[in-house]
Structures are given as structure tokens and as C-alpha cells.
């Protein structure tokens, strides 16, 4: 998935938490893009079966939520480490992590997400934090 498509998927998901129904114009306004740009991106996400359009409303599919969760697991992990260990601002760390995650192959992305989840589960089971206390990446659920 391109970083642009991921931004649209994130926007649709975030708007769904705020609004009763999400429309194409809501996404366009949220991302400060034209309706045509939003339409094209939404169509690409629909073709990949990440979203559905029901009565002009945009809804994430189960597949869309699953893929988004995988991407966000990696993005949160990477951005936390970039901020903490590299002195990168939070906003820049998030952008860099999002772009890097989108550059991964599907196989690599899946492997990294599974690794992070297993590390988080290990930290939860031991009552600690991921990769030792100096990492600062606390388990979020």
C-alpha cells in the first residue's frame, strides 16, 4: 500500500470514531485534498477490499481493519523508538515510520508486525516494557 493510500485509510478509520457515518467529502476535508483526489484513493482502497461504500458511506472492511492494525503496530513502534533514541520530533518520527512501513514488502511487514506483537506480549507477561526498560516503548492496547 502506498503512503498516500494508508493516509486515506487512517483518515477513514479516525473519522469513523468521530462521526456516525463517513463520506468521501469528510475524508477530503480531513486530508485537505480535492474531492477528485479522495474519490480516486477511495476507489483504489475499495478495489483492494479495504473499504466498502454503502449508501455513499465509507466503511472499513474486516480486511481493511486487519491491514491497518498491522501497519499501525509497526508505525507506533518505530516512531516511539525514533523519538526516544534518535531525537526525532514526534511528528517527524511518525511520518518517517509511516513512509518506511509502506516501503516494506508484504512479507517483511507481516514479519515485523508479528515480531513486535510477540515482544509486546512478552513484556506484558513479564510486567515490563518492550526491549528492556530503556526503550520507552510501553505496551499499548
Roles of regions detected by a PLM:
Residues 1-10:
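Short alpha-helical segments that sit at the start of domains
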Residues 18-28:
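Short acidic, hydrophobic short linear motifs in intrinsically disordered regions
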Residues 27, 38-48:
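Basic amphipathic alpha-helical segments that dock to polyanions
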Residues 36, 91:
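Key DNA-contact positions within bacterial/archaeal DNA-binding proteins
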Residues 46-56:
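A short, conserved structural fragment
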Residues 56-74:
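Basic, amphipathic "hinge/linker" alpha-helix immediately C-terminal to the N-terminal HTH DNA-binding motif
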Residues 95-141:
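C-terminal regulatory/oligomerization modules of transcriptional regulators
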Amino acid at each position: 500500500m502506498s503512503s498516500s493510500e494508508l493516509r486515506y485509510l487512517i483518515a477513514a478509520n479516525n473519522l469513523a470514531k468521530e462521526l456516525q457515518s463517513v463520506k468521501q467529502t469528510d475524508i477530503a476535508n480531513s486530508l485537505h485534498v480535492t474531492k477528485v483526489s479522495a474519490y480516486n484513493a477511495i476507489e483504489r482502497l475499495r478495489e483492494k477490499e479495504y473499504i466498502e461504500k454503502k449508501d455513499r458511506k465509507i466503511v472499513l472492511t474486516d480486511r481493511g481493519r486487519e491491514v491497518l492494525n498491522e501497519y499501525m503496530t509497526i508505525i507506533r513502534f518505530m516512531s516511539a523508538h525514533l523519538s526516544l533514541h534518535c531525537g526525532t520530533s514526534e511528528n517527524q518520527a511518525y511520518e518517517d515510520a509511516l513512509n518506511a512501513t509502506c516501503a516494506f514488502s508484504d512479507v517483511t511487514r507481516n514479519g515485523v508486525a508479528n515480531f513486535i506483537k510477540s515482544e509486546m506480549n512478552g513484556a506484558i507477561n513479564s510486567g515490563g516494557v518492550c526491549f528492556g526498560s530503556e526503550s520507552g516503548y510501553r505496551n499499548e492496547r
